[in-house]
Amino acid sequence: MKPRPPGPSVNGVVCVDLGGTRLRVAVFRPDGTILQSNVIDTPRDEPAALVEAMRKALAQTAVRATAAVVGVPGPISYRDGTPLRLPNLPGWEDHVSAHRLSAELSLQVRIANDADLAALGEHRFGAGRGCSDMVYVTSSTGVGAGVIINGRLLHGRWSLAEAGHMIIDWRAGRTVEDLGSGTALERLTGEDGATAAAKARAGDATAIEAFREVAQAFATGVHNLVHCFMPERVVIGGGVSQAGDLLVEPIRRQLDQCNMGCPTAGKDVVLASGGDDVGLLGAYALWRDAIQASPSVRNPDAPRDAQNPHGLNA
């Protein structure tokens, strides 16, 4: 008699980072082990591809997933898991609601803002570890932010800190995202943010000049957030952050020029260290926190003190 392949023995979670450029899907065990991870270009005209990508990831593992956490690039209603608007993915709003995804996948689904999840991921596993109050700001296709206060993710009914939509040029009504994002950089250089960053680091004069313009706009947005929340640390992420000091130094200079009498607020400005999977790790952390807070949904097969290789409980 042939041995039967092992069936699903533990509950897991499907974590999704839906970006304007990339769609990342991973399946986690309760202990934080990533069993399967897939990355594809976001098919902007095919919102149904999200469900197919999640099903594919599940089919490639032996985990019995019971839940999913999906990070989306825009403000959401945290009460019912409905995206309010996805500026970089117009038309996707109805396809990524918690109610619709739950019905299509037969999973408990939670929707969160992607920058909120990245902030949580950096706070638990990356450059924000060890600090109580932190602002995470990312510049990629768009600009987003997440805020950690007293060690907890901060949001209101309709998300929080939609930094990309702060107006910094009031005469023309232009926002931080209009002027300080990877899209703005691409408009100036003809290259995506990561490529332009590499060229700037290599000394390309056109890329350096474009970065100066974009970095100044981005720094203004970070400056405004720092004076709203007075964090002890600012973590900078996203594709544009690959430029390193070309992006970070303008932020530090602007904060040095105006600190509102608080000499330490926002002075600890660092680059994100969680890598490309930080949004997925934040989604896992959100799910893990939920099952720890609700024993009724805890996986009975996983011990309460299961060690997390990413240091969740550290």
How would you describe each model-predicted region?
Residues 109-113:
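General beta-strand structural signal in soluble alpha/beta enzymes
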Residues 82-93:
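A charged helix-plus-loop insertion that forms the helical arch/lid used to bind
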Residues 17-21, 138-142, 159:
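A short acidic Gly-Thr/Ser loop motif
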Residues 1-69, 78-82, 101-107, 121-135, ...:
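ATP-binding/phosphotransfer module of carbohydrate and carboxylate kinases, centering on a glycine-rich
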Residues 38-40, 87, 157:
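Short hydrophobic alpha-helix segments
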Residues 23-27, 143-148:
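Short beta-strand scaffold segments in enzyme catalytic cores
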Residues 114, 140, 283:
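Active-site glycine-centered loops adjacent to acidic/histidine catalytic or metal-binding residues
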